[in-house]
Amino acid sequence: MSKRKAPQETLNGGITDMLTELANFEKNVSQAIHKYNAYRKAASVIAKYPHKIKSGAEAKKLPGVGTKIAEKIDEFLATGKLRKLEKIRQDDTSSSINFLTRVSGIGPSAARKFVDEGIKTLEDLRKNEDKLNHHQRIGLKYFGDFEKRIPREEMLQMQDIVLNEVKKVDSEYIATVCGSFRRGAESSGDMDVLLTHPSFTSESTKQPKLLHQVVEQLQKVHFITDTLSKGETKFMGVCQLPSKNDEKEYPHRRIDIRLIPKDQYYCGVLYFTGSDIFNKNMRAHALEKGFTINEYTIRPLGVTGVAGEPLPVDSEKDIFDYIQWKYREPKDRSE
């Protein structure tokens, strides 16, 4: 998944960018995931608010905005900044950890370890490449490219290549590009592809060849340029659109391809399409209706709360129907 969220270009972009920066601090430095989720939810709700927010009290009327966040909004609106963020930015350790986690392959724990060793910048990482694993070296190599958002127009071209090459390998494959792209986003952080084949179910033996032959085909046409990791059901790598004539080169982009059993495919598509907030709301509604949903299955809950056998699913709509929830197109799944 992509490391960076798109900067908010909305009526309340300053507020949402502030909340996103706080969220990243809580995740990468404090490792307080509940606070990270709270800031993310508030930022998401405010981003969709159709009016310019004039006070914390106005923001507090929105779901997910509590007293503490409302107070921060008041401070930001009054001064144009936030003391807590100013402090974080001035703290060398916090800002260095936050920065290093932007390198693909470097999580909060690795970032903290590097900072403890005095490695705080890209230049420091380059001087200490022997301390980096394979994924981190690729992340460093393409740092500038991975920082750039992928415009929707490029994502559509990338999707065409992937879907066409997949069908060349075997016309029975089903592939879906998920993430914010499927929800209609104007830009994406990376490309997330789900793949299945009728011959592969949760009852089958493992079939890594189904994933690997697709990866090899995409390498053959020079779309996939680097491999970060290649397992039996998940490939993580780097791809690049081919240049047309003498046009400038396209940036390298992160791509993940997941092979999913056919009977679990649409639960996977639903989950990886998101958004996170939509998925949480849908899972909560499912529980109220006596079902449990995850990225693999939907199962009925018995009177004791124990989940039963997975229900058959042949489309995303089947999942909505089971829990008696009106079907929502991917573009309507922000919350």
From Swiss-Prot:
Positions bound to dCTP: 149, 180, 183, 189-190
GO terms for MF: 5'-deoxyribose-5-phosphate lyase activity; class I DNA-(apurinic or apyrimidinic site) endonuclease activity; damaged DNA binding; DNA-(apurinic or apyrimidinic site) endonuclease activity; DNA-directed DNA polymerase activity; enzyme binding; lyase activity; metal ion binding
Binding site for K(+) 2: 101, 103, 106
Effect the entry attributes to changing residue 39 to F: No effect on 5'-dRP lyase activity
SMART domains: HhH1 (SM00278), POLXc (SM00483)
Positions with a binding annotation for dGTP: 149, 180, 183, 189-190, 192
Binding site for Mg(2+) 1: 190, 192
Catalytic residues of the enzyme: 72
Catalytic reactions on record: DNA(n) + a 2'-deoxyribonucleoside 5'-triphosphate = DNA(n+1) + diphosphate; a 5'-end 2'-deoxyribose-2'-deoxyribonucleotide-DNA = (2E,4S)-4-hydroxypenten-2-al-5-phosphate + a 5'-end 5'-phospho-2'-deoxyribonucleoside-DNA + H(+); 2'-deoxyribonucleotide-(2'-deoxyribose 5'-phosphate)-2'-deoxyribonucleotide-DNA = a 3'-end 2'-deoxyribonucleotide-(2,3-dehydro-2,3-deoxyribose 5'-phosphate)-DNA + a 5'-end 5'-phospho-2'-deoxyribonucleoside-DNA + H(+)
Annotated phenotype, changing residue 137 to Q: Decreased function in base-excision repair; decreased DNA-directed DNA polymerase activity; no effect on 5'-dRP lyase activity; no effect on DNA binding; decreased interaction with PCNA
Residues the entry annotates as binding Na(+) 2: 101, 103, 106
EC numbers on record: 2.7.7.7, 4.2.99.-, 4.2.99.18
Record's function text: Repair polymerase that plays a key role in base-excision repair. During this process, the damaged base is excised by specific DNA glycosylases, the DNA backbone is nicked at the abasic site by an apurinic/apyrimidic (AP) endonuclease, and POLB removes 5'-deoxyribose-phosphate from the preincised AP site acting as a 5'-deoxyribose-phosphate lyase (5'-dRP lyase); through its DNA polymerase activity, it adds one nucleotide to the 3' end of the arising single-nucleotide gap.
Domain notes: Residues 239-252 form a flexible loop which appears to affect the polymerase fidelity.
Protein name as catalogued: DNA polymerase beta
Taxonomic source organism: Homo sapiens (Human)
Lineage: Eukaryota, Metazoa, Chordata, Craniata, Vertebrata
